[in-house]
Amino acid sequence: MISTTIFIITSLAAVTYGRSHLTVPVGSTCTLQGPQEGYVTWWRIYDNGGFARPCDQPGTKFSCNGRDLTIINITSNEQGFYYGTNYKNSLDYNIIVVPATTSAPRKSTFSSSSAKASTIPKTASAMLKLPKIALSNSTAAPNTIPKSTIGIITAVVVGLMIIFLCIMYYACCYRKHEQKGDALLNFDI
């Protein structure tokens, strides 16, 4: 039971690891970079789990050039999660809008990542609502580790921990009943 809980928490942490958090002031313009190759489809994921394609919305609030999404004159309505994918690679952004008097980072294009614990339930909800969109991020800078590699390493470590716990359990139970012979080690012919 504990190993299952650890596996679920580790999996959710690996999924939210690549989310980029961006703080922008009200009234500014922000450009979100999509994956490098192919045509990118952008999705906006709302807090309630719903989603929409910002490039298909009427008006001049969102500008898409095939790869990047530009949000013009940001208000608090544009705060939330944005997801860009070319169905092979993806990038995930969390935009936090602050009042214009609050200082914000000068660079409006963001590509580093950090994850908050409060984003895990929102990410899980969004994953359940978007089954056709692949949630893998294999476009990485040369000095960063892709999410798929982190997921594989995490799965191997959890698997080895389970095997180790099973071996320890077997060793402890076998010591209690030393008079019993081990059927696997009995070679009587």
Curated annotation (Swiss-Prot):
Glycosylation sites: 73, 137
Origin: domain of life: Viruses
Keywords: Early protein, Glycoprotein
Keyword NADP (UniProt): no
Protein function: E3 proteins seem to be dispensable for virus growth in tissue culture cells. They are potentially important for virus growth under special conditions; E3 region may help adenoviruses to evade the immune surveillance of the host.
Family classification: Belongs to the adenoviridae E3_20 family.
Protein name as annotated: Early E3 20.5 kDa glycoprotein
Organism: Human adenovirus B serotype 3 (HAdV-3)
